Regions:
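Short, charge-rich amphipathic interface segments used for partner binding and complex assembly
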Residues: 12, 16-68
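Low-complexity, glycine/proline/serine-enriched flexible coil segments
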Residues: 3-5
């Protein structure tokens, strides 16, 4: 895969991850803060943390691809 294709693929992956973050943030914001909702909120928090790590890795890979141009 060429550099331009790599960057395009990384951009697509970033967009998907960022869309998922926005959706999770919206869902978490809509849930009332009750004892019953804590497991769901914890699940959202774990997924958001994982997505943040994945997004950072994609950003690093994208920066490396740009540097290799």
């Amino acid at each position: 895969m060429g550099n331009e294709e790599t960057i395009a693929e990384l951009n697509a992956q970033l967009m998907m991850k960022e869309t998922r973050v926005r959706k999770l943030a919206r869902l978490a914001g809509e849930l009332p803060l009750t004892r019953e909702n804590l497991p769901a909120l914890e699940c959202y928090a774990l997924e958001l943390r994982s997505l943040a790590y994945q997004i950072r890795q994609l950003q690093v890979a994208k920066a490396a691809a740009f540097a290799a141009r």
